[in-house]
């Protein structure tokens, strides 16, 4: 397989990660209006004034635009080069369509303004584009290996975990994005409960938003542990499934730890960006599991 195509896949995947982290940086630093109501220009000019907010917002737009070109190039190239692989064309379309959607949503928020409910979708839409690019890149590397042609087994319980967890993870991601866009990150200053001084249950809207996300994340944490234990017991000989769940377990632990650190560090930017990074990586792996389930079901039907 063309080494240049593999290189493009890796670069595009990393670029999309920067888009996700950059979006989180914009939100965490309150830089969403750093370029005013102007788009694609920044305060009516190509280059922004030298303020922190405008530089962060302009940089995010620049990285997103560059990533858009890379995603389009990867989609076209993989379509031509490995279009015979069943998932390629679907993923190519998904990567481009959802990247355009997230760009339009971001632009609309700048020009017209938007509610927290709508803006919380921005990160989730970007996640789908990132996962599509990641899977496209994996297909490129897979085309040179024998893994795709190997038969494998996924039982009903594991299929339930793989499908259920990816859907539920997307819900949890939305609640986390809603926490950011409603400025609820520090609504509860203790952990695991909201406050040991004013009672353990939340009393205000922002506290309910924060605790709702924590409750949803706790269930996801427990579910991934259960799936990882099942994989360790039943799928140790199937490396993709076994190691996929082991890595997912590590990522969800890091995700939880960074979330707790955000609270106790009083919104340290490094921990906040790590929180976005870990969930992005986890979502990518879970989407790969979804790909495996689809392949297994086709394998059974043959």
Swiss-Prot record:
Cofactor: heme b
Membrane topology (Cytoplasmic): 1-6, 83-91, 142-158, 230-242, 294-302
Compartment list: Cell membrane
InterPro entries for this protein: COX15/CtaA_fam, COX15/CtaA_HemeA_synthase, HemeA_Synthase_type1
Cysteine pairings via disulfide bonds: 35-42, 188-194
Keyword Heme: no
Primary location class: membrane
Domain of life: Bacteria
Chain segments annotated as transmembrane: 7-27, 62-82, 92-112, 121-141, 159-179, 209-229, 243-263, 273-293
Metabolic or biological pathway, per its Swiss-Prot or TrEMBL entry: Porphyrin-containing compound metabolism; heme A biosynthesis; heme A from heme O: step 1/1
Membrane topology field: Multi-pass membrane protein
Catalytic reactions on record: Fe(II)-heme o + 2 A + H2O = Fe(II)-heme a + 2 AH2
Complex and partners: Interacts with CtaB.
Name of this chain's protein: Heme A synthase
Organism encoding this protein: Bacillus licheniformis (strain ATCC 14580 / DSM 13 / JCM 2505 / CCUG 7422 / NBRC 12200 / NCIMB 9375 / NCTC 10341 / NRRL NRS-1264 / Gibson 46)
Chain's gene name: ctaA
């Amino acid at each position: 397989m063309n080494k240049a195509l593999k290189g493009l896949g890796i670069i595009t995947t990393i670029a999309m990660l920067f888009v996700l982290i950059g979006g989180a940086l914009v939100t965490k630093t309150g830089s969403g209006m750093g370029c005013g109501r102007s788009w694609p220009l920044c305060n009516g000019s190509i280059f922004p004034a030298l303020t922190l907010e405008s530089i962060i917002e302009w940089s995010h737009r620049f990285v997103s635009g560059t990533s858009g070109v890379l995603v389009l190039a990867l989609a076209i190239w993989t379509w031509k080069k490995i279009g015979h692989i069943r998932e390629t064309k679907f993923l190519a379309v998904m990567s481009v369509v959802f990247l355009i959607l997230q760009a339009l949503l971001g632009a609309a928020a700048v020009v017209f303004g938007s509610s927290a409910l709508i803006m919380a979708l921005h990160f989730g839409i970007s996640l789908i584009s990132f996962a599509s690019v990641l899977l496209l890149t994996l297909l490129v590397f897979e085309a040179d290996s024998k893994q795709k042609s190997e038969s494998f087994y996924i039982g009903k319980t594991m299929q339930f975990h793989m499908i259920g967890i990816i859907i539920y993870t997307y819900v949890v991601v939305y609640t986390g994005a809603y926490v950011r866009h409603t400025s609820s990150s520090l609504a509860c200053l203790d952990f695991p409960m909201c406050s040991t001084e004013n009672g353990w249950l939340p009393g205000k809207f922002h506290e309910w938003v924060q605790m709702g996300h924590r409750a949803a994340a706790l269930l996801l944490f427990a579910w991934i542990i259960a799936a990882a234990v099942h994989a360790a017991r039943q799928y140790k000989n199937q490396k993709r499934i076994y190691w996929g769940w082991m890595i997912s377990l590590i990522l969800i632990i890091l995700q939880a730890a960074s979330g707790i650190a955000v609270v106790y560090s009083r919104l340290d930017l490094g921990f906040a960006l790590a929180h976005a990074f870990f969930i992005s990586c986890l979502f990518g792996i879970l989407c790969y599991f979804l790909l495996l389930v689809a392949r297994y079901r086709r394998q059974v039907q043959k």
